[in-house]
Amino acid sequence: DLLRLCLISKSACLPRLVQLSHLHTSPNSQAPVPALPEKGGKTRHGIIPEEIFQLLYPKTGVTGPYMLGAGLLTYILSKEIYIINHETFAAACMGTVIIYGVRKFGPDVAAFADKLNEEKVQKAQEVKDLAMTSLAQAVLDEKKEQWRAEGRQMLFDAKRNNVAMLLETNRRERVHMVTNEVKKRLDYQIALQTLHRRMEQEHMVNWVEKNVVTSITPQQEKTSIAKCITDLKVLAKVQQAKATV
Amino acid sequence: MTLSFFDQFMSPTYLGIPLIAVALTLPWILFPTPSARWLNNRLITLQGWFINRFTQQLLLPLNLGGHKWAALLTSLMLFLITLNMLGLLPYTFTPTTQLSLNMGLAVPLWLATVIIGMRNQPTAALGHLLPEGTPVPLIPVLIIIETISLFIRPALGVRLTANLTAGHQLIATAAFVLLPMMPTVAILTSIVLFLLTLLEIAVAMIQAYVFVLLLSLYLQENV
């Protein structure tokens, strides 16, 4: 606070004054402060405390304090303890203005002061509420994470299955490849064998042909040609006979 | 205990003890010390709010050097407002009607602003004596006029004294005239008195504010 700052700085540079830093040093000043009352003391007609009326009620009843007030006023005026002079009128005027001002603007000012305090409380309350909601949210999130963590076995199984499938696929691919390679080798062997057989066959056929051709003597050739001619003549005769028939 | 017109302006003494000291220091008890609580009662809340707002508004046009004067100006304002408003109550003495008090406040503070200006930025402080854009032939005359204006600034105190004294005196006169009057005419006079009362309340607050405002203005020029 500004005033406190001035006082403290003053105490630093003027040591001959009261050492203000020696005040409020005992632990008594740190004791918890009792709560403030909600409302101020009850008053009647704005100024006179209700307690006076309660005090006088047993002896003088309800009108007691009023009689006291009126009697006091009369006494003061008649004994000229208080003289009515120009200040009285000025006081009456000023009193009217003050009472009017307080009655008219009092509740508004009080509401304003209450609003200032209320805003202070509300700001702190907002912080507190925000902290509470965020913490509650954090608790929910944590619970969700714990629930999620429970399913970790399923996750591991799925992953394990995945890996097993991959391995199986790989194995089958390799088996397939091996089969293909073996088949290729065997096909080669078969092709080789057929080639061999064909070549042998061709060779043999060639050899037989060659031998047959070389074994045909010129005698055989003549006899065969003569036979062919006679066969042809017979055939021609038959044909001529068929044609004339 | 008859009162004359000017009794209200006599500096009160009792058995040789100048009671003006009491009149100057007792109003302090009307301002409760802010407590160590977080939420206070209405009086302390309003007081704190008012002081904060006032200081903030007052320090807006001042640069950082002028902020050193914050405590002084705010406490001066509270002091003057309290003295003025309490003086409106009947049978009270208003210390601010004494020229000695007001000049005692105004002259040192004004002189402080002048000396600060002359020490820290003498060129700018002297430059204030000649407003911008004056035609050349007018310069000598204007410098003299501005110097006179500078030295008449302690009239801050005279202004406060005059306003308050006049107001109180008017109320006293109107009330005095009201005393032996016939009721029909008295009604008019009481209306006058009522209006004067309202005016006085306003003047009490305004004059205190003007005092502090002008001081801050002088500070703004020089700091």
UniProtKB/Swiss-Prot annotation, chain B:
Top-level taxon of origin: Eukaryota
Protein's UniProt name: ATP synthase F(0) complex subunit a
Species assigned in the record: Oncorhynchus mykiss (Rainbow trout)
Subcellular location per the Swiss-Prot or TrEMBL entry: Mitochondrion inner membrane
Predominant subcellular localization, coarse grouping: mitochondrion
InterPro entries: ATP_synth_F0_asu (IPR000568), ATP_synth_F0_asu_AS (IPR023011), ATP_synth_F0_asu_bact/mt (IPR045083), F0_ATP_A_sf (IPR035908)
Record bears the keyword Plastid: no
Entry's family note: Belongs to the ATPase A chain family.
Membrane-spanning residues: 12-32, 69-89, 98-118, 132-152, 165-185, 197-219
GO biological process, alphabetically ordered: proton motive force-driven ATP synthesis; proton transmembrane transport
Membrane topology designation: Multi-pass membrane protein
GO annotations of cellular component type: mitochondrial inner membrane; proton-transporting ATP synthase complex
MF-aspect GO terms: proton channel activity; proton-transporting ATP synthase activity, rotational mechanism
Function: Subunit a, of the mitochondrial membrane ATP synthase complex (F(1)F(0) ATP synthase or Complex V) that produces ATP from ADP in the presence of a proton gradient across the membrane which is generated by electron transport complexes of the respiratory chain. ATP synthase complex consist of a soluble F(1) head domain - the catalytic core - and a membrane F(1) domain - the membrane proton channel. These two domains are linked by a central stalk rotating inside the F(1) region and a stationary peripheral stalk.
Catalytic activity as recorded in UniProt: H(+)(in) = H(+)(out)
Assembly and interaction partners: Component of the ATP synthase complex composed at least of ATP5F1A/subunit alpha, ATP5F1B/subunit beta, ATP5MC1/subunit c (homooctomer), MT-ATP6/subunit a, MT-ATP8/subunit 8, ATP5ME/subunit e, ATP5MF/subunit f, ATP5MG/subunit g, ATP5MK/subunit k, ATP5MJ/subunit j, ATP5F1C/subunit gamma, ATP5F1D/subunit delta, ATP5F1E/subunit epsilon, ATP5PF/subunit F6, ATP5PB/subunit b, ATP5PD/subunit d, ATP5PO/subunit OSCP.
Keywords in alphabetical order: ATP synthesis, CF(0), Hydrogen ion transport, Ion transport, Membrane, Mitochondrion, Mitochondrion inner membrane, Transmembrane, Transmembrane helix, Transport
